[in-house]
Amino acid sequence: MSKHHMEKLTCPSCHHDGDFEVWDSINTVLDPEMKEKVLNQSIFLYTCPNCGENFRLNYPILYHQMEDLVMIYLVPESEVEKTYEIFFEKNALADFHTEKYLNRIVTSANQLVEKIQIFDAGKDDRMLELVKLLATDSILKNDPDIEFDELRFAVDDDGTNILVIINKGEITGAVDIDNMYEFASSHCDDFKDLRDDEDIVINLSLIHISEPTRRRGISCAVFC
């Protein structure tokens, strides 16, 4: 079930107190309308009732897309290891193990949204982290002077899978990745089935590229 509670907040602009609804967990079967509020990140937005200023808040949340057996935990960076250990404690969340849930831990609202979009598109997030490496290499070869902070998965209006190029919080371009995804998939046949893999923290920092793979020009990476 979805859980939420109210918290008192003081506006940092006008110092007026107001109420903010904090969602501890969201179940998209029981509350289907909440999925869009997660995707547009409005559940993290507080509007001061006095001055009208908007403020973005970050707080932990468990996102449960029960119809697809997907659970994504948004926690602070400092809580990742603890959350991982709790999840794999003996008998902890046993039903979710037996049902082959797809579980992930993320540390930002943007990562949460990206994971939802990846799984809704039927993609493997492990493979997409490899695609980001390929895309980064391609972008820099075409424009060595380009500056960007992040590549983030999205689905274009016409259904094309893309990586948006983000620099200083602004989208500055996009890359069509369907061919790169197919290429990476064809060269990486040693991954476990997505729902059999016990790794639940998947990002670029967890990828090690093996030397034989480097020589082939594609990363069949080891996630650890």
Residue positions per predicted region:
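Single conserved hydrophobic/aromatic residue that forms the stacking wall/gate
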Residues: 207-224
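Domain-exit/linker segments immediately C-terminal to small folded modules
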Residues: 47-135
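Short, surface-exposed beta-strand/loop "edge" segments at domain boundaries and coil↔beta transitions
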Residues: 80-84, 169-176
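N-terminal cysteine/histidine-rich coordination modules
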Residues: 1-76
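Electrostatic, structured charged patches in enzyme active sites and in nucleic-acid/phosphate-binding
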Residues: 181-195
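Long, low-hydrophobicity ectodomains and other hydrophilic envelope-associated domains
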Residues: 137-140, 145-147
